[in-house]
From Swiss-Prot:
Cofactor: Mg(2+)
EC number(s) per entry: 2.4.2.18
Positions of Mg(2+) 1 binding: S91, E224
Recorded metabolic or biological pathway in which this protein acts: Amino-acid biosynthesis; L-tryptophan biosynthesis; L-tryptophan from chorismate: step 2/5
The name this protein goes by in its record: Anthranilate phosphoribosyltransferase
Cofactor details (free text): Binds 2 magnesium ions per monomer.
Role this protein plays: Catalyzes the transfer of the phosphoribosyl group of 5-phosphorylribose-1-pyrophosphate (PRPP) to anthranilate to yield N-(5'-phosphoribosyl)-anthranilate (PRA).
Binding residues annotated for anthranilate 1, in chain numbering: G79, N110
GO cellular component terms listed in the entry, alphabetical order: cytosol
Domain of life: Bacteria
Binding site for anthranilate 2: R165
Organism: Buchnera aphidicola subsp. Baizongia pistaciae (strain Bp)
Keywords, alphabetical: Amino-acid biosynthesis, Aromatic amino acid biosynthesis, Glycosyltransferase, Magnesium, Metal-binding, Transferase, Tryptophan biosynthesis
Length: 331
């Protein structure tokens, strides 16, 4: 372990095996908080490599509580967070809309660690119990098209890690690997990252993890599709990786201002999202949600982004998504 730590502190890159060994030690609490802080900061300053991401994921997956495997195709829609954009919870809102559109979503979620408001914080405000058994979560997915897998419940060895991350209050390798640690282990995902440089390494990791179809998005260093800038896409499909750029007119909507998607604390985000899901939200933020849902449609085989966006807007404006919220809160 001393050799591995010295490599990190000297700015050298670890291979998959070394990273696996390191993160195995972290999971087994063999690394103290001071060492862990130094490791996370050193990796962040140098930049995490593809092999380090993969090694960390493999180690963490071995210590995860499992989820009953569905027999049907389902997806996650998730972001790394830590982009300091102070936007509303776009992926969480998009997941709810996607489920109301008929798609199965196993949403990996967490509380606020490196952002003001985490997905779990919003879901709790809506009265949705995210701390239910894996079996009951699976039933929720079966019956209501969506379930929420609360990270601390499935990754119990992350408790010490979470404490350190909350103290550091910066984006670390755990932001990068968290979307890759969904306990349901979907083969479809829409994953947002807040750094263009991370997109291809993550696509390669998803390929190694045998994802069937994945779309990685990044726009203006925000881990979502946005309408105030172009969005870079890297798509993994049938083991082939392609990249392209999307603009708002590809979705049939107009550019908006970055401030249009700003949120705030949990209460403020809750109020904004509630209006959106009731079909009463401002057009710019509603359309931002719709274009993210349009990308979700794409991994289920619906490739026409304009039609996808149009249908998502129709569902949002109907208020059906808020009806879904009520069902989920009673589950």
């Amino acid at each position: 372990m001393k050799i591995i730590l010295n490599k990190i502190y000297q700015g050298d890159t670890l291979n998959i095996s070394e990273t696996y060994t390191l993160f195995k030690s972290i999971m087994l609490k063999k690394i103290n908080n001071i060492e862990l802080s130094a490791i996370l900061i050193a990796l962040k300053i140098r930049g995490e490599s593809q092999n380090e991401i993969l090694g960390a994921v493999k180690a963490c997956l071995e210590h995860m509580i499992t989820f009953p495997k569905p027999t049907y195709m389902f997806s996650d829609i998730v972001g790394t967070g830590g982009d300091n954009s102070n936007s509303i919870n776009i992926s969480t809102t998009s997941a709810l809309v996607g489920s109301a559109c008929g798609f199965k979503i196993a949403k990996h979620c967490n509380g606020n660690i490196s952002s003001k408001t985490g997905s779990a914080d919003i879901l709790k405000k809506f009265g949705i119990n995210i701390q239910i058994s894996p079996e009951k979560s699976k039933k929720m997915l079966d019956e209501l098209n969506i379930c929420f897998l609360f990270a601390p419940q499935y990754h119990i060895n992350f408790k010490v890690v979470t404490q350190v991350r909350k103290i550091l209050r910066i984006k670390t390798i755990f932001n990068i690997i968290a979307p890759l640690l969904n306990p349901a282990m979907p083969k479809l995902t829409v994953m947002g990252v807040c750094n263009f440089k991370l997109m291809l390494p993550i696509a390669q990791v998803l390929k190694t993890l045998n994802y069937h179809h994945a779309i990685i998005v990044c726009s203006d260093n925000i881990d979502e599709v946005t309408l105030h800038s172009f969005t870079k896409i890297i798509e993994l499909k049938n083991n082939n990786i392609t990249s392209y750029i999307l603009h708002p007119d590809d979705f049939g909507v107009k550019y908006c201002h970055k401030n249009d998607i700003l949120g705030g604390n949990t209460e403020e985000n809750y109020n904004i999202i509630k209006k959106i899901l009731q079909g009463k939200g401002p057009s710019a933020v509603t359309e931002t949600i719709a274009v993210n849902v349009a990308i979700l449609f794409k991994i289920f085989g619906y490739s026409n982004l304009k039609k996808n966006t149009e249908y998502a807007l129709k569902v949002i404006r109907s208020g059906k998504v808020y009806e879904k919220i009520i069902q989920l809160s009673k589950f």
